[in-house]
Curated annotation (Swiss-Prot):
This is Probable glycine dehydrogenase (decarboxylating) subunit 2. The lineage of its organism: Bacteria, Bacillati, Bacillota, Bacilli, Bacillales. InterPro entries: GcvPB, GDC-P_C, GDC-P_N, GDC_P, PyrdxlP-dep_Trfase, PyrdxlP-dep_Trfase_major, PyrdxlP-dep_Trfase_small. The modification N6-(pyridoxal phosphate)lysine is found at K274. The glycine cleavage system catalyzes the degradation of glycine. The P protein binds the alpha-amino group of glycine through its pyridoxal phosphate cofactor; CO(2) is released and the remaining methylamine moiety is then transferred to the lipoamide cofactor of the H protein. It is an enzyme of class 1 (oxidoreductase). Its EC number is 1.4.4.2. Its cofactor is pyridoxal 5'-phosphate.
Amino acid sequence: MHKTSEQTLIFEISKAGRVAYSLPLPTVDEVAAEELLPAHLLRQEDVELPEVSELDLVRHYTALSNRNHGVDSGFYPLGSCTMKYNPKINEDMARLPGFAHIHPLQPVESVQGALGLMYDLQEKLAVITGMDEVTLQPAAGAHGEWTGLMLIKAYHHARGDFKRTKVLVPDSAHGTNPASASVAGFDTVTVLSDERGLVDLADLKSKVGEDTAALMLTNPNTLGLFESDIVEIAKAVHEAGGKLYYDGANSNAIMGIARPGDMGFDVVHLNLHKTFTGPHGGGGPGSGPVGVKKDLIPYLPKPIVAKTAEGFVLDYDRPESIGRVKPFYGNFGINVRAYSYIRTMGGAGLARVSKEAVLNANYMLARLKGAYDAPYDVYCKHEFVLSGRRQKALGVRTLDIAKRLLDFGYHPPTIYFPLNVEECIMIEPTETESKETLDDFCDAMLQIAKEVEETPDVVLNAPHTTVVKRMDETLAARKPILRYQPKQEVHV
């Protein structure tokens, strides 16, 4: 059977002798590789690279690109990921020659504009979060978590307090929290949630103590609920001598409305590729700046951009610093995009962003909670969780619902996270989606709920319209095929 271009590997359309590009003539004398490299470094067999024409190359990758789904092609309600629209003006700003055509090793006097942007971004992020100083070095959220925990470790060790080896993490936390704590050399202690979906204060107080380095907390949490006991939580941690760490993954709910620093947090990381519209994933990279209160400033990674009478400089004179956490000064291009977004929106605009993100989430929750179980039937913040346990009782799981959504042209929400909600469906619409889009998605979810009751096989066998149908995900995880292996010719 003939395979379409979407089903064929580029290796499978290779024909010997075909080329996609004519290389220019060399401008230097040609020298054989054997004259330059020792024999053990030379390839003994031809490399198996595809030989295709330019037209075949373009058609192949264009077909593959049409299978991608991103915020520019459709609704992307991935909970706890803030898949908001990335304004294209940010791309224009990042491509300005003064930002795009410079090198981090240039003399500082020749990159004053870039350093000025970095300094102003540090200042603005400090104001937004209620922190006293910010570093732009961390490359993404988990990297920011690790950096923040290393700052906390440096703080405790500088005080001769080496017994603080434990980091408390709620059972609803992002998986990166315990992972970052482990990589930073801490032991993780899980704090339970109560019947409200919030931190169980009694459980927290029974576990915080002289060995506590920090509590990592997201507020609002991953259930989309605001930790209303945050002042008492901060008091319990601080009285035990620990620090309070803010995972900024859900900051889109509180910008311009509440600040982590005012809640009692000592360290904050932000995800500029989420909350502040830097592109995600293949459109990245990310950026995870970390802000701290005054007593942690000495330990920040160096250098920090500082302002002097002569201009902006890179301040390396920080003897207590934990050192660099990334080459140079962070993912500068994403920082430019975030700065453009902040300057465009202004303080009032950022507050409106959060209000509309919360409004959109509550609107969707109100429409869907009749067809799906809502474990916490209260007002949410920027995201909310549903449970597919009602559908599971009819033989259809959350995974099946997610697969069926593909037929409607939607990227599925986050599923099976947080772990403390059975058959979890986690939805975050963000502020950039219209009511019409929200209604269309809710209509699809309601139709699927009806199908589960009336025609379950339609859901169980979904997706029906995508190029790739159901895969054996267990086999793919256990026996992945990670590279192309040409079939061996059989000679009779």
